[in-house]
């Protein structure tokens, strides 16, 4: 990271930033064409290892790319605001407040029914705040649960 003064390394603060993000964008390489998909998500972190879960249709371009090229980039951000420094009316005196996370990892389709249930529960918890969810097997089998195992991730903020 070029701007070390903006780097966030505290795991508690990183978790706070992730918890306030509502969308994670995954970028795929589709034979030289970048394909970016915005997704709602849930996650778990253990010992500075992050795993994100998403859900979606069982067929389509995203699913095809997961099978074809599972190494992806991802991005999420929150608290974005553009403002003038010291009330200036000069274009170059504007800046942006933000918190963001970028990284790369490996995506896969979850096949284990219990891990699918866990992934869906994490997605719902992140988006609603409610921890306990019941999913019958028919519901679980109707969707793809996608797992992103993070290889590298950085967090940055500017106030």
Which role does the model predict for each range below?
Residues 1-19:
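Extreme N-terminal tail/first-helix region
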């Amino acid at each position: 990271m070029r701007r070390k003064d903006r780097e966030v390394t505290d795991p508690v603060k990183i978790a706070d930033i992730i918890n306030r993000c509502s969308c994670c964008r995954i970028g795929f390489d589709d034979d030289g064409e970048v394909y970016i998909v915005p997704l709602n998500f849930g996650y778990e972190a253990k010992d500075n290892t992050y795993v994100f879960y998403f859900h979606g249709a069982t067929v389509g371009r995203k699913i095809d790319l997961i099978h074809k090229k599972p190494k992806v980039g991802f991005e999420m951000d929150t608290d974005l605001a553009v403002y003038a420094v010291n009330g200036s009316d000069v274009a170059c005196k504007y800046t942006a407040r933000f918190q963001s996370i970028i990284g790369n990892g490996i995506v896969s389709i979850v096949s284990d029914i219990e891990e699918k249930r866990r992934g869906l529960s994490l997605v719902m918890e992140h988006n609603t705040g409610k921890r306990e969810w019941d999913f019958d097997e028919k519901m679980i089998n109707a969707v793809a649960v996608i797992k992103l195992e993070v290889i590298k991730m950085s967090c940055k903020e500017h106030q």
